[in-house]
Amino acid sequence: KKNVFNKKVKYWTLERDGKDITVLSAVGHLYSLTPDNPKDKVYFDLHWAPLFEIDKKYKNYTKDYVRAIKKYAKDADSYIHACDYDIEGTLIGYHALKYGCGEDALKKSSRMKFSTLTKKDIVEAYENRIPIDRHQVDSGVARHILDFYFGVNISKALMKSVSAAKKRFLKLSAGRVQTPTLSILVDREKEIKKFVPEPYWLIKALLDGEIEADHVDGKIFDKTRAEEIFSNCENSDAAVDKIKYSNSTTKPPVPFNLGGLQSEAYNVFGFSPKKTQTIAQSLYTAGYTSYPRTSSQKLPESLDFKSIFLQLSKNSEFRTHISALPAKLKPNEGKKEDAAHPAIHPTGILPDKLDKDELKIYELIVYRFISV
């Protein structure tokens, strides 16, 4: 049953195995770091606080989510953490439990782990819950603390330094990832500006109007030499000197992780990485594909390939390619692993309606899954 708290926050109630269950949501992080003493020149003493208390202007909308969690968490017998199974998702749910439900809630909590939003996977994750991964929690906490130390403290120092030199205030920012990345871009831009292009010539022969042959010297940097070769070859007959046959085996591509999907979508469609990730997330939320923010290039043995292919075969275009697959299905996996999630793959559920860009990404994922 769908309900609404305070006219803003949706939540659901249901019964399973004789238990009343309330399903509540967060809206990203509900808690963040803030300094113990805002007047300190450098911030190293920090604590976690609700976002709506830290940023009342832009994050006030999170208040009702925190209130809903606190209200419906009272007197609960147990708690289930079902946020995305990655470091950030784990930290979001952990803080909701610790600060929204209370410290004791952590002792009565379990974790659902799933990589697709199909009914089958959700039920399996519910029935096979695991403990909350404290390593993921610690990793998330450490990242947030380091981001705060670098981002806030160095940004303050940077603005103070530049303002003193320029005799005026400038709002600047630095960050743990942002600043080194900017440095790489600056170095690359300097290389580009220093580059002096050197002209060269390519000589090609068009044979029988169909075959294009390159001169054996490839790039020719001497114009006189290029003109001499061209003059000698112009209007001449070509003779086949040797024919060589060889067989080569091409391995199938590896399954998509997020980076691979973004790279391929850019090469094929010109989509920006952000656009690809947004579309992949919407496909995951709709239950059509698996969790997108994964670094894995591996597909687990537990994945029911035959069932997925059977469902995908309801689409005639997919069926044409699937029917050409060998009887024994063994994917060509890459080296990269992710303990939390497998490589991106279709769930088998065919979309009812997608816009043209969503369809492009969905088909890209499906055809890569078939081809591996």
What annotation goes with each model-predicted range?
Residues K1-F150:
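Intrinsically disordered, low-complexity regulatory segments
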Residues N3-V4, T13, G18-N60, F169-Q281, ...:
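Long, highly charged, low-complexity internal segments
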Residues Y61, A68, K74-D75, L117-D208, ...:
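C-terminal or mid-to-C-terminal helical accessory/interaction module adjacent to the motor/catalytic core
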Residues E88-I92, D138, A142, S173, ...:
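Hydrophobic (often cysteine-bearing) scaffold residues that line and stabilize catalytic clefts
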Residues A26, A82-D84, L206, G259, ...:
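Generic beta-strand/beta-sheet core signal
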Residues D133-Q136, G140, D147-G151, A286-I365:
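Extended, highly charged linker/hinge segments and catalytic-adjacent loops that couple domains
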Residues C101-K108, V268-P273, A286:
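Secondary-structure transition/capping motifs at alpha-helix termini
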